[in-house]
Amino acid sequence: MLNEQTMHKLYAMKLSGMAESYEEQRQQSQMGELSFEERFAMLVERQWIWKENRALTRRLKYAKLKLDACIEDMDYRHPRGLRRSTIEQLVSCEWIKYHRNCIITGPTGAGKTFIGCALAHQACREGYRALYFYTPKIFRQMAIAHVDGRITNLLKKISRVDVLVIDDWGLATLERHQYRDFLEILDDRHGSGSTLITSQFPTSAWHDIIGDPTVADAILDRLVHNAHKIELKGESMRKKKKRGDEITNAAEDDRKEKKEKKRRPDPSDQGSDNANLGGKA
């Protein structure tokens, strides 16, 4: 009865991790060999892990990352200019702590979005809030927000996150209201948040994308001067993966065909057997 009351109170206080650990301890006889301090430490540790996992789940849900990418899945095998030392430096999230930016450029399919999402995922692990936007989508949302009067709230939401991910920047030349909105976002975030940009185009081409030289200078000043840069090169990772899958499938088909041939009886052997049978008759 006392145990049931204790469990009820733990759940009522939202200490689910501690309650689960307590229930496990009750069912394990060897727990009696541990001291009270050791058992209590186990309860607290489980509650801490439970709380941290819940918080991480909320941060990832809020971030709305395009890809379920993480640092552990980073591929360094292909020669595309991705240095392990650069990623290891960014994994520490010091760049976020000091409100620096990150710019990832390279051809289509080079893995820019994957790397960007992996770094944002790592930021969420470290307790930072991230928010992902595909470039056309963020401008579309801002255009709608201007019409229905939500633009102030939207800009406030964007400015408050620790890491803002803008994916596929520069797909089209910006219109006047777009680059002004974007400058306002960067101005609000300058010195208080980190922005991660992925783009097919090098930063030297961004003046043409923005259009207005004065605004372009202001945007690049806020984005580029304190940014970590990852410049990817080479063939599309998607094409390489597809080609690798095709080779793997072809090899698998070849193995299956050879296996099938071994199982299939040789017609010449059957003819020889029939001849022998005829001779005996």
Task: Give residue spans per PLM region.
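Short hinge/gating elements
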Residues: 8, 24-28, 73, 101-102, ...
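Interdomain "pre-motor" coupling segment immediately N-terminal to P-loop NTPase/helicase cores
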Residues: 11, 16-67
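Extended interfacial segments that mediate partner engagement and assembly in macromolecular machines
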Residues: 53-105
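Conserved P-loop
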Residues: 82-160
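Walker B motif beta-strand of ABC-family P-loop ATPases
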Residues: 163
